[in-house]
Amino acid sequence: MKILVTGGAGFIGSAVVRHIINNTQDSVVNVDKLTYAGNLESLAEISDSERYSFENADICDAEGDGLYFGQHQLDAVMHLAAESHVDRSITGPAAFIETNIVGTYVLLEAARNYWSGLDDEKKKNFRFHHISTDEVYGDLPHPDEVNSNETLQLFTETTAYAPSSPYSASKASSDHLVRAWKRTYGLPTIVSNCSNNYGPYHFPEKLIPLVILNALEGKALPIYGKGDQIRDWLYVEDHARALYTVVTEGKAGETYNIGGHNEKKNIDVVFTICDLLDEIVPKEKSYREQITYVADRPGHDRRYAIDADKISRELGWKPQETFESGIRKTVEWYLANTNWVENVKSGAYQSWIEQNYEGRQ
């Protein structure tokens, strides 16, 4: 099987590529624009494989997209290329509209044109797997907002869309496009929506790597509001396994929610990281003393939580990592891979961190 992975140099994309090359006999064509969060160092361990090839390209380039399909005789697409940071979408939404909506449209058209020329058997087996987020659903009631005897709601595959940021709105739009191409043209598409990912090779603008690295450098650990926002945390290698299961075994036209069964308040995640660092690299004062509370993000969703029963029941996937095991592996990875960290911390990244957090004191 030959799979086109878009955004394969990003955090989740690189985990998918590593999983496919290391654990299957399938081949990967990785198409990535290499924006600030794309890093080929994350693929160093598999880059010499004969089953792996890389194209430095933009999915918004219709001519290029069509070329890759024809050249490589693809059996499936795993579409992960996206602008994905909520804070960046608030200060600069245009890039999110261009990549997440227009880019998805261009890729869908390239896939449809290629698929329409396949023989019947290959048409039937072809898959266009669009990887999305649980943020398209909006947010859920917080435990502080409901009676103690009430059952807390979870996002299911039939939850109505209610995106609340430019990022989630752009992903919701792309989800609708993918489903429309299935219904209108018959293109065999699948959508998956995941909870918050964490793990090795995570670009340090996101909460967990930001906290780990700031703590080690003696910097403030910025927490939005009171830190009581709740997220369901999914170890990235568990997610990569799930995505491969979906593209190879999932049913065309279906949606699969993928979650880690690990609901945690943001502040508790930060406490856990600080306590692990106190254990592994102790210093005179606890890392918790570096925690700083900053003004909350506009429109910050209160709670996300995934019901992953469908993918477990129909495809047999379950996460292997608990949050406790996964976060320890993550902290240990960052401690052992300081060269990777230094190489991704460019001047552009540093200026963005200063712009985003210094104004929130």
Curated annotation (Swiss-Prot):
Function: Catalyzes the dehydration of dTDP-D-glucose to form dTDP-6-deoxy-D-xylo-4-hexulose via a three-step process involving oxidation, dehydration and reduction.
Enzyme class name: lyase
Residues reported in the UniProt entry to bind substrate: 84, 133, 196, 206-207, 222-224, 231, 266, 296-300
Name of the encoding gene: rfbB
GO molecular function, one term: dTDP-glucose 4,6-dehydratase activity
Keywords assigned: Lipopolysaccharide biosynthesis, Lyase, NAD
Keyword NAD applies: yes
Entry coiled-coil feature ranges: none
InterPro entries, per the entry: dTDP_Gluc_deHydtase (IPR005888), NAD(P)-bd_dom (IPR016040), NAD(P)-bd_dom_sf (IPR036291)
Annotated catalysed reactions: dTDP-alpha-D-glucose = dTDP-4-dehydro-6-deoxy-alpha-D-glucose + H2O
Family affiliation: Belongs to the NAD(P)-dependent epimerase/dehydratase family. dTDP-glucose dehydratase subfamily.
Binding residue positions for NAD(+): 11-12, 32-35, 58-59, 80-84, 99, 167-171, 197
Protein name: dTDP-glucose 4,6-dehydratase
EC annotation from Swiss-Prot or TrEMBL: 4.2.1.46
Domain of life: Bacteria
